[in-house]
A protein has these predicted regions:
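Gly/Pro-rich active-site loop or hairpin
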Residues: 44, 86-92, 127, 165-169, ...
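N-terminal pre-domain/capping segments
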Residues: 1-101
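Active-site beta-loop-alpha junctions enriched in small/polar residues
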Residues: 9-13, 36-38, 72-74, 119-121, ...
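Active-site acidic/histidine proton-transfer and metal-coordination neighborhood
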Residues: 61-62, 77-188, 198
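Acidic (Asp/Glu)-rich catalytic clusters
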Residues: 21-28, 46-68, 100-110, 140-149, ...
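C-terminal helical cap(s) of enzyme catalytic domains, especially alpha/beta-barrels
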Residues: 304-315
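Hydrophobic faces of well-ordered beta-strands that scaffold small-molecule active sites
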Residues: 4-10, 29-33, 67-71, 114-116, ...
Length: 315
């Protein structure tokens, strides 16, 4: 197994296998991709993935390669359960069905999970939006359990742009830890460095905060620089080692080393996390859960190949 998985979210080539091969050719061993139109709420034909799932799984297994799916940007976990303006039962809600569709594809192709943004409360109160998120996530997890769909909903740390919920990392982790240990088998965390920077955190501080409480739940890192000032609550990515980026190079270098060190600690059998619940701490002490350190560069070609090599050197 790789010590750390490094890859990118790049435009899809003719096939997913071709895209995976492109990542491999450029020194990476993981890929993030969309399986739905990122700007549309339409649900595609799952047969498109059923027919190629075995080939994707075989490529990933033989080359120790990881796949991550990013959800459609149209999904808002905090919104009401409506189709248009019409309130509907949650099982008929179109955006709920879209996320379940993406999670089903994730299971089919052997993806680790689906990264999804936390919700925006829009015109409702933050409390109302958070309750919608709780209900939505719990319902989707129940659906995954009933249908034996083995994949994860990976919640991404927010920048706090507009009415985006949970920009405070303590609040984000508290919300995550409201879910039971059984529910958390279907959950994970994605740390986006540009987002936490926008939310007001040094990226290494954010990493340590998550590791102190939920290290084995931290599955994916979106490793980006930022175009905006720290604490601006704005989500604007920049190329990782861009000299115009606002996240200092030394912070990025230290962050990469932290990721590698934590992965090595975990492989040596040292529990990486402490839990707030005594019951869960005891269970953790008996059997440390292991996760993969997956770094995704959200950088266009051709820069990502150079960045992969630099990350390997810094790690």
């Amino acid at each position: 197994m790789a010590d750390i998985y490094i890859g990118a979210h790049i435009n899809r080539e003719k096939t997913i296998i071709n895209t995976m091969e492109s990542i491999t050719k450029n020194g990476g061993n993981c890929l993030q991709l969309f399986v739905s139109n990122p700007r549309s709420s339409s649900i595609g034909n799952i047969e498109n993935y059923t027919n190629i799932a075995d080939d994707i799984r075989k490529y990933a297994t033989t080359r120790d390669f990881k796949i991550i799916i990013h959800s459609s940007y149209t999904i808002n976990l905090a919104r009401d359960f409506k189709n248009g303006k019409r309130a509907v039962p949650i099982n008929e809600c179109h955006w709920i069905q879209l996320l379940i569709h993406e999670l089903t594809i994730s299971h089919l192709i052997g993806s680790v999970g689906v990264v999804v943004h936390v919700g925006k409360h829009t015109t409702q109160s933050p409390e109302y939006g958070l309750e919608n998120m709780r209900i939505a996530i719990a319902y989707i997890i129940e659906t995954l359990q009933k249908n034996d769909i083995k994949t994860k909903i990976i919640l991404e740390t927010p920048a706090g742009q507009g009415t985006e919920l949970l920009p405070n990392l303590n609040d984000f982790l508290a919300f995550y830890n409201e879910f039971s240990s059984d529910q958390q088998k279907y959950l994970g965390i994605c740390l986006d460095t540009a987002h936490v920077w926008g939310a007001g955190y040094d990226i290494c501080e954010a990493y340590q905060m998550i590791c102190n409480k939920n290290a084995s739940d931290l599955i994916v890192v979106h490793l980006n620089n930022s175009k905006v000032a720290k604490g601006s609550n704005v989500d604007r990515h920049a190329t990782l080692f861009d000299s115009t980026g606002t996240i200092p190079y030394d912070s990025i270098k230290k962050f990469i080393k932290l990721c590698n060190e934590k992965k090595q600690e975990q492989e040596q059998g040292h529990p990486m996390q402490t839990r707030q619940s005594h019951t869960r701490q005891t269970k953790q002490a008996k059997q440390a859960r292991k996760c993969d350190a997956i770094i995704i560069l959200e950088t266009p070609l051709p820069q990502y190949a150079t960045e992969i090599e630099l990350i390997k050197l810094l790690a």
